[in-house]
Amino acid sequence: PGAVHQILYGIGAVALAILAFECLPDVRQAMQMLNTVSQTSKQTKHNGAWVYGSSSARFTIVEYADLECPYCKDYFPQLKAWVDQHPDVNLQWHHLPLPMHEPVASYEARWAEWAGIERGNDVFWLAVELIYQRTRSNGAGTAGNPQIPGLEDRQHSIDNCASSNPAVRQTVVSQAHKASQDGITATPTLVIKDKVSGRSIKLQGAPDGDVLLSAIDWLASTKDL
């Protein structure tokens, strides 16, 4: 039995080493592709949160979203376009794959997460956009993984790491757990934060631009109690 255990342990170690190698980005390929993806936009270094818009914006809208949620799918382009028109507001993504949409929802969340790790902030948001464009929603998923322009050589790595990379898996699980701790169990849900006052407000569903502006005005005008 001891010899068998040693053999099995050795096989497992080799498998983990191969997986780790597969999930490591190719530095030379990344450098060659630097100017082929999002040439006209600025890449933002990943620091634990994916943020769309100005990093210096006073207000942050944290969107708790599921990539298989049909309501999130419809709302995402509207919210993104609204942020484009309001430079003092940025958008932060928070993964919340719902149990009813598993296992596809978590896989897609990991896929977008790893795409962002591979090539940065802009590619993460592009991955989210592509998934929403292609998914049949409600757990049905996409007909094949999205293809990100300029990342063809890394596609296999992204697909594999979305399935098996433990760090990416933990990121998605941790964000979903944090949402549950905060009492957020439905998507989409927004939490708007004011960096100046430190206050925040939660909005459930898909509020339109007028509601978003009203919430921001309330945060900006509320006095200390």
Stretches with model-predicted labels:
Residues P1-C23, Q147-L225:
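C-terminal cap of thioredoxin/glutaredoxin-like
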Residues S54, E63, G205:
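Conserved strand-loop elements at the edges of beta-sheets that form or border functional pockets
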Residues K42-F59, V83-D84:
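A short beta-strand-turn-helix
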Residues T60-V62, T189-L190:
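Catalytic His-Asp charge-relay segment
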Residues Q39-T40, P70, A167-V168:
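Short, flexible loop segments at the rims of nucleotide/cofactor-binding pockets, characterized by
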Residues P25-K42:
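Ser/Thr/Pro/Gly-rich low-complexity linker/stalk segments immediately outside membranes or between
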Residues V62-L67, K73-G150, D182-T185:
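Structural alpha/beta surface segment adjacent to cysteine/selenocysteine redox centers
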